[in-house]
């Protein structure tokens, strides 16, 4: 039996559940075209701010043995650049599945203005609101402030009527899973994306007795294999706590078909790849699809729905 990776997500059908994580291989229109023409099932734009941002000083992204450390600071070309791209692509490829569009304002008001621009546009895809960037100096992660998260979503859904998901930071306590899930269940969210990088880690070059990234005295977001257990826990925690209408996108530590299978088993509907995409380029999607299919066929599964969320307890 041949395994199918076909994935239905918010009334869209994708050939497979794989996509890039926002921030990786999606800064320029060239990179976005490469994603669109790759074996990825879907793709998402770089998190956009109102105006172009250079981000933090370099070095700000370093590959390390089991993953990466980054303190990018949201470099991007500004919302108009990405909105123009996705609108043109919609016209040129009207039958293609929906594009994901990411925004990450520096304040609630900026986020509201960015979302108003999307609401008023002809964009017919899926919007992701990033409430979890850990790498902008002086700007705390909104999603660690539960009251501020609720206030933000109250104001957003007062006017935003298009499909909207939010990107969350990792949580580490059952009480926090419970509190955040209760808040999110009050809103018509399309999905949550768990997780963003684990914020404010430190990697050290022993030879130089130095940190390896320049911003924030070397503190940066950790990605890759280091974060997979935390990512899986967050995917599972929200999958079991959120209304079934709110889907979960799994992000964190996916570099093989086995990693993908684990995320899906925990309940993920789609899968985003960051660190390993940065290392391998878009060819990773073809490899990881084959690996996932091989696992499914060895287990006798013909579709992802046969095992999604079916994690056994002991």
UniProtKB/Swiss-Prot annotation:
Coiled-coil positions: none
Gene that this polypeptide is encoded by: URA1
Record note on quaternary structure: Homodimer.
CDD domains: DHOD_1A_like
GO MF annotations in UniProt: dihydroorotate dehydrogenase (fumarate) activity
One GO cellular component term noted in the UniProt record for this chain: cytoplasm
The protein, known as: Dihydroorotate dehydrogenase (fumarate)
Organism expressing this protein natively: Saccharomyces paradoxus (Yeast)
Pathway connected to this protein: Pyrimidine metabolism; UMP biosynthesis via de novo pathway
Localisation: Cytoplasm
């Amino acid at each position: 039996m041949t395994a199918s990776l076909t994935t239905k997500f918010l009334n869209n059908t994708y050939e497979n559940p794989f996509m890039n994580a926002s921030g990786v291989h999606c800064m320029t229109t060239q990179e976005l075209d490469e994603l669109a023409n790759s074996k990825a099932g879907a793709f998402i734009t770089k998190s956009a701010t109102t105006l172009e941002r250079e981000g933090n000083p370099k070095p700000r992204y370093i590959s390390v043995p089991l993953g990466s450390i980054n303190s990018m600071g949201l470099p991007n070309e500004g919302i108009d650049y990405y909105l123009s791209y996705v609108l043109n692509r919609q016209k040129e490829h009207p039958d293609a599945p929906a594009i994901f569009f990411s925004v990450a304002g520096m304040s609630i008001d900026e986020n509201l203005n960015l979302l108003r621009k999307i609401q008023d546009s002809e964009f017919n895809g899926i919007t992701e609101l990033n409430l979890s960037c850990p790498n902008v100096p002086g700007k705390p992660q909104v999603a660690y402030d539960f009251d501020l998260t609720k206030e933000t979503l109250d104001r957003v859904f007062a006017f935003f009527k298009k499909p909207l998901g939010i990107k969350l930071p990792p949580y580490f306590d059952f009480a926090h899973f419970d509190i955040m899930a209760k808040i999110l269940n009050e809103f018509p969210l399309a999905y949550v994306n768990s997780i963003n990088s684990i914020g404010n880690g430190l990697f050290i070059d022993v030879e130089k007795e130095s940190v390896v990234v320049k911003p924030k005295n070397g503190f940066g977001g950790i990605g890759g294999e280091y974060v997979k257990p935390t990512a899986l826990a967050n995917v599972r925690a929200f999958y079991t706590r959120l209304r079934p209408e709110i889907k979960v996108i799994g992000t964190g530590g996916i570099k093989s078909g086995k990693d993908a299978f684990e995320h899906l088993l925990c309940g993920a509907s789609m899968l985003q790849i960051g660190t390993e995409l940065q290392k391998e380029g878009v060819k990773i999607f073809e490899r990881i699809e084959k690996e996932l299919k091989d696992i499914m066929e060895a287990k006798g599964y013909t579709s992802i729905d046969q095992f999604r969320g079916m994690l056994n307890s002991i």
